[in-house]
Amino acid sequence: MSFTTQVKEEILNLDSADKNELSAIIKMSGSLGLADKKLSLSIITENAKIARHIYALLERLYRINPEIKYHHKTNLRKNRVYTVFLDDNVEQILADLQLSDSFFGIETGIEQQILSDDNAGRSYLKGAFLSTGSIRDPESGKYQLEIFSVYLDHAEDLAKLMQKFMLDTKVIEHKHGAVTYLQKAEDIMDFLIIIGSMEGMEAFENIKVMRETRNDVNRTSNAETANIAKTINASIKTINNINKIKETVGLESLPIELQRIAQIRAAHPDFSIQQIADSLAVPLTKSGVNHRLRKINKIAEDL
C-alpha cells in the first residue's frame, strides 16, 4: 500500500460529515450532465473506499441515495473507476454548497467563506487531498505533496488557503491543469495534522528521522574510512622510509628519541598516532609523535 493510500484510508475513518469537504470533492472530481432532461452530477474516483465515503456524505448531509457505478480502465482489468451518480436535487445541492455558477456549471475558485474560516479550510483541504492529492514516498528522501486542479484559479486559491496555515506552498501550471504543492518535510507533516492524519504524520516523521540517522551514520563511516585510509597511507610511507634508513645508515644513526618512534611504527603499521604515543615509556602528545615522524621522513628523503 502506498503512503498516499495509507493517509487517505486513515482520514476516511474519521467520523465527519462536513459540507466543505464534500464541496472540495465535487469541485475537484465532479462533472455535470443532463439525464432525462434533469441536471445530473457524476463524481469519479479510482478508490472504492472514497466512492463509499462520497455516498455516505451525500446520504448523511442531503438524505439522498446516489448510485455507484464502475467500469474498468481500458486494457487494465484490475483498475476500476467508480462513479457516484445522482440526478435528484442536484441544483439544490450545488446551491447549498455555493458551487453553481450562473451558467449551470461548477464554480472553479474557492468560496471566500472557506478561505476565511480555519475549520472550513481544514475540511476543504481534507476533501481536496482525498480527491486528487498524493504524497511521494518519504523513503525516497525527496519530499513532495501535490494536489491537482483542473483550473489554475482553483490551484492558486488552494495555495492561498494552505498559506493561511503557514505552509510554504507553490503552484505550477501544466498542460491539462495546475498543481499546488509542498516540498518541505515540515510543511508536509503540518498539512497531515491539518487534515487529521496524525498516524500519517508520525509515520512520515519516523521515516524522515530514520533516513537522517542513516545518512549521518554513513557520513561518519565515510569520514572514518577516509581517516583510516589516510593513516594507513602515511604509515606505509613512514615504514618505507624507516626501512630505507635501516638499509643505508642503520636505525642506530637516528637520535635516541626517534629510534623508539621508528621501532614502534615499523612493528605496528596499523597503530594510530595516539596508540604510538601511548606505547612510549616517556609520555608524548600526538603532535609530538607527528613531529618526530616528520623528522624521520625528512632524514630518509635526504639520504
From Swiss-Prot:
What GO biological process terms are annotated to this protein in UniProt?
A: cell division; regulation of sporulation
Give a single Pfam family match: LAGLIDADG_WhiA
Q: Where is the signal peptide?
A: none
Record-level Gene Ontology MF annotations: DNA binding
Concerning InterPro entries, the annotation shows:
Homing_endonucl (IPR027434), Sporu_reg_WhiA_N_dom (IPR018478), Sporulation_regulator_WhiA (IPR003802), Sporulation_regulator_WhiA_C (IPR023054), WhiA_LAGLIDADG_dom (IPR039518)
Q: Name the DNA-binding stretches.
A: 272-303
* Keywords for the protein's UniProt record, in alphabetical order: Cell cycle, Cell division, DNA-binding
Entry similarity comment: Belongs to the WhiA family.
Q: What is the documented function of this protein?
A: Involved in cell division and chromosome segregation.
Name of the molecule in the record: Probable cell division protein WhiA
Q: Which organism is it from?
A: Streptococcus mutans serotype c (strain ATCC 700610 / UA159)
